């Protein structure tokens, strides 16, 4: 009897709280602010993840990342989402295209972090 009550309760809860599907995102170079953590985790070299002033750049989302010199490692990106598939395009149109399941994202291996030019203050 207890099992039946638990099953019925589970069915009622599932029907009361419908599963939210992520809205589609048309290709953009400026993803919504509330999605920056997601995009900057998996596409961290994209220019929208960095704030650069006078050639010195700080990651806007991940505070533990080093401060770096603005260089070719930071690239223009376009991101999009369609039917649960997240994509980002790096560099010039058609340069590198990475596709992943939005619910089970994966890291892209290019460009490698060793190409970052870490900023070191020499006046300390």
From Swiss-Prot:
Positions annotated as glycosylated: 76
Record's signal peptide: 1-16
InterPro entries for the chain: ASFV_fam_110
Keyword Secreted: no
Entry's family note: Belongs to the asfivirus MGF 110 family.
Summary of the function given for this chain in its UniProt record: Plays a role in virus cell tropism, and may be required for efficient virus replication in macrophages.
Official protein name in the record: Protein MGF 110-8L
């Amino acid at each position: 009897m207890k099992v039946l009550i638990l099953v019925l309760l589970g069915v009622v809860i599932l029907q009361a709280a419908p599963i939210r599907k992520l809205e589609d995102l048309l290709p953009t170079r400026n993803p919504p602010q509330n999605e920056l953590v997601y995009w900057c985790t998996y596409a961290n070299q994209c220019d929208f993840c960095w704030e650069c002033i006078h050639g010195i750049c700080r990651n806007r989302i991940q505070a533990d990342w080093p401060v770096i010199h603005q260089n070719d490692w930071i690239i223009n990106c376009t991101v999009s989402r369609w039917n649960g598939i997240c994509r980002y395009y790096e560099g010039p149109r058609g340069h590198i295209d990475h596709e992943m399941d939005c619910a089970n994202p994966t890291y892209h291996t290019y460009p490698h972090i060793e190409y970052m030019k870490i900023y070191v203050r020499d006046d300390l």
